[in-house]
From Swiss-Prot:
Transmembrane segments: none annotated. HAMAP family: SecA. It is an enzyme of class 7 (translocase). It comes from Pediococcus pentosaceus (strain ATCC 25745 / CCUG 21536 / LMG 10740 / 183-1w). This is Protein translocase subunit SecA 1. Part of the Sec protein translocase complex. Interacts with the SecYEG preprotein conducting channel. Has a central role in coupling the hydrolysis of ATP to the transfer of proteins into and across the cell membrane, serving as an ATP-driven molecular motor driving the stepwise translocation of polypeptide chains across the membrane.
């Protein structure tokens, strides 16, 4: 550990020295900038933009741009960034994390890299933990950016898509992390490019970066959609396929695929009262019929699945065991439930999902600032490729951080906490009490009420009220109880006469499992060189001590217990033992987050393929023939390959021709005699020629290339979206089940990767087959809705 610390200190010192030289250059421009009148200073923005267009880089103009933004901040905000803030700004511009203590002006520091990067014209996102902070910072700092000729937007959950688009099109956009995530997912579900709101993700600067990238890293953002109407569709499809006779469908047992014959198609059109089963409007119906066919004629009860207590359970074909928690994908499970007349489990379906880890790793450049990141430096480096640099404080820290006090019981600990609060309150010194849980803050509040000590309780519920309470927490005689995260982002300024009383006293009622959260609480006191004090009160009955308290501490306390219930140990040993317990918990939490990321990376790779495909389709402005016809060709290749494995005279021509009739052309356009005597390659070429002719006929039927393009978009998007949402569900089921089973001696992650890859390839095959069938067999109509 000592070596790691030494490395950090040395690398920080090197980095600060390097950036210090640049800061000197910015400082050297101070007088030159002061000489410029307002118009000339504002004109610098246009000059910088032109220089960037002429080939200069952001790094080339950094020194001048920082000097301009610094002088503008003085004129507009009445604030002049210190030298340490210039260094912090450069760390952020470099795509790294600036660790700046509370009160060191993070918000002002951010204006420098935000201004510089906004000059590139690709958009800068300033990300905050709540909408109140986004509103506050955008209106306060927005004055500066607007004065310098840049546009500023704020993105919130109440906005319409048009308002969001306007906010994202600004040079600088303030938003919460969750709103950016949901907008990204929604953008990848739209069917018209005009409905998208975001531009490509360029540069994000995250405030309270540890909270978003570490504490919330495992939180998935999920968009769900209800799917109740499809329950009846499963039942109707099931009733229909149960009426079929042998000649109405063909089964290919090798690939376990099944399709309707021309006869079966006619029966379906009568049953469902539709003119053309393969019309685009019937894509959902087709999907349900396909699954009902598989459920009834391919899947066998007590071999592929069992029915137990009204539930369909999968049987593992290798072990013969029931696979708890797994469901067949792509709607097959629901089709079997309809077949067996048990309840169809088809509630909310996940339409799209992503974790913050993968969302923010998609930005071209990512940076962040916080008062506490050093303890998580390894995680930031390994997962986000961001280095943490600790920025020196503008003035030396004058806070008195006292050693922990340890009591035998919770009761004796809280007795001591209340006594300390009372003593400080009588003196008039403001007190901020930090609790780990909401119930602790309420319990302590009741104790203070009993003592008649006026106080305010702050639970992170009302952000606007929260800021007001935090602002007043530094006034004479104030007693504020707050849970961990409450009030981050708002400074506690000391009221008149408080410095003389010793500044803000911070009391921690227990140690959090993360050192970072404890450091955040301490850091509320002693801002900008103010005096202050911090003290943690612990007991042997605290969660952390019960889980990780070492034997040495327990021995000490067993001796204490005999002496006095209210006895206290004040010792560096306690603090060291607690810290080592915290490090163990942090290590466990990091491993858990890393594990989540490894699983999520499988989904990320798949998501990127599907979203890129959708983007290509949505953005296309002339023709999708180059996307669509290769899908048709690959589908033909797969079908022909599967049925020409044997010698030529044993080719399964009947199935190949049946495929051509149901997915490519009409009955009269192909007969078995047409492909007799052909090699596999000749059959493929012949079918591809038929498909090309079919495409040309569709072009002729419509005349208008715009309508053909629209038709192509409708077909591809409907099929892709249907299969992708089913696939997300299936991957979710797979993930839960590999965790449950642990696959004996096998690595669950490897199993998830391999099985997930197989399922994804299967989905792509299904998408291409269904797109082929829908496009080739549909009649193109005008005014189609995507």
């Amino acid at each position: 550990m000592a070596n790691i610390l030494k490395k950090w200190v040395e690398s920080d010192a090197r980095e600060l020295k390097r950036l210090g030289k640049k800061a000197d250059k910015i400082e050297a421009l101070k007088e030159e900038m002061e000489q410029l009148n307002d118009e000339k200073l504002k004109a610098k923005t246009t000059e910088f933009k032109e220089r960037l267009q002429n080939g200069e880089t952001l790094d080339d103009i950094l020194v001048e741009a920082f000097a301009v933004a610094r002088e503008a901040a003085k004129r507009v905000l009445g604030l002049f960034p210190f030298r340490v803030q210039l260094i912090g700004g450069m760390v952020l511009h470099g795509g790294n994390i600036a660790e700046m203590k509370t009160g060191e002006g993070k918000t002002l520091t951010a204006t420098l890299p935000v201004y510089l990067n906004a000059l590139g014209g690709k958009g800068v996102h300033v990300v905050t933990v709540n909408e109140y902070l986004a509103e506050r910072d955008s209106s306060e700092m927005g004055e500066l950016y607007k004065w310098l000729g840049l546009t500023v937007g704020v993105n919130s959950s109440e906005m319409t898509p048009d308002q969001k688009r306007e906010a994202y099109n600004c040079d600088i956009t303030y938003s919460t992390n969750s709103e950016i995530g949901f907008d990204y997912l929604r953008d990848n579900m739209v069917v018209y490019k005009e409905d998208m709101v975001q531009r490509p993700l360029n540069f994000a600067l995250i405030d309270e970066v540890d909270s978003i990238l570490i504490d919330e890293a495992r939180t998935p953002l999920i968009i769900s959609g209800q799917t109740e109407p499809t329950v009846t569709l499963y039942e109707r499809a099931d009733r229909y396929v149960k009426t079929l006779a042998d000649g109405d469908y063909t089964i290919d047992w090798e690939s376990k695929s099944i399709s309707l014959t021309e006869n079966g198609i006619r029966r379906a059109e009568n049953f469902f009262k539709t003119d053309n089963l393969y019309d685009v409007e019937n894509s959902a119906l087709n999907h349900h019929i396909d699954q009902a066919l598989r459920a009834n004629y391919i899947m066998t009860k007590d071999k592929d699945y069992v029915v137990s207590d009204g539930e369909v359970l999968i049987v593992d074909s290798f072990t013969g065991r029931v696979m708890e928690g797994r469901r067949f994908s792509d709607g097959l499970h629901q089709a079997i439930e309809a077949k067996e007349h048990v309840e169809i489990q088809d509630g909310a379906k996940t339409m799209a999902n992503i974790t913050y880890q993968n969302l923010f790793r998609m930005y071209r450049k990512l940076s962040g600032m916080t008062g506490t990141a050093r303890t998580e430096a390894e995680e930031f480096r390994e997962i986000y490729n961001m280095e943490v640099t600790t920025i020196p404080t503008n003035r030396p820290v004058a806070r008195d951080d006292r050693p922990d006090l340890l009591y035998p019981t919770l009761e004796s600990k809280f007795k001591a906490v209340v006594k300390e609060i009372r003593d400080l309150h009588i003196k008039g010194q403001p007190v901020l009490v930090g609790t780990v849980a909401v119930e602790t803050s309420e319990y302590l509040s009741r104790l203070l009420d009993r003592e008649g000590i006026p106080h305010v309780v702050l639970n992170a519920k009302n952000h606007a009220r929260e800021a007001e309470i935090v602002t007043n927490a530094g006034q004479k005689g104030a007693v504020t109880i707050a849970t961990n995260m409450a009030g981050r982002g708002t400074d506690i300024k000391l009221g008149p006469g408080v410095v003389e009383l010793g500044g803000l006293a911070v009391i921690g009622t227990e140690r959090h499992e993360s050192r970072r959260i404890d450091n955040q609480l301490r850091g509320r006191s002693g801002r900008q060189g103010d005096v202050g004090m911090s003290q943690f009160y612990l007991s042997l009955e605290d969660d952390l001590m019960i889980r990780f308290g070492s034997e040495r501490i327990k021995d000490l306390l067993s001796r204490m217990k005999i002496a006095d219930e209210d006895a206290v140990i004040r010792s560096g040993l306690i603090s060291r033992q607690v810290e080592s317990a915290q490090k163990r918990v942090e290590g466990n939490n990091y491993d858990a987050r890393k594990n989540v990321l490894q699983y999520d990376d499988v989904m990320r790779a798949q998501r990127e393929v599907i979203y890129a495909e959708r983007q290509q389709v949505i953005m296309e402005e002339t023709s999708l023939k180059d996307v669509l016809m290769p899908m048709v060709d690959r589908t033909i290749d797969r079908v022909v390959d599967a049925h020409t494995q044997k010698t030529q005279k044993n080719f399964d021509l009947e199935t190949i021709v049946e495929f051509a009739r149901t997915a490519l052309v009409s009955d009269k356009d192909i007969h078995q005699a047409d492909v007799e005597g052909m090699s596999a390659k000749e059959i493929k070429d012949y079918l591809k020629q038929l498909a090309d002719q079919m495409y040309i006929e569709k072009e002729k039927a419509l005349y208008d290339p715009a309508q053909i393009l629209e038709f192509e978009k409708v077909v591809i998007l409907r099929v892709v979206d249907q299969h992708w949402t089913d696939h997300i569900d299936a991957m979710d089921q797979l993930r839960q089940s590999v965790g449950l089973r642990g696959y004996g001696q096998l690595n669950p992650l490897v199993e998830y990767q391999q099985e997930g890859y197989r399922m994804f390839n299967e989905m792509i095959t299904d998408i291409e087959y269904e797109t082929t069938r829908l496009f080739m067999k549909s009649e193109i109509r005008q005014n189609l809705q995507r």
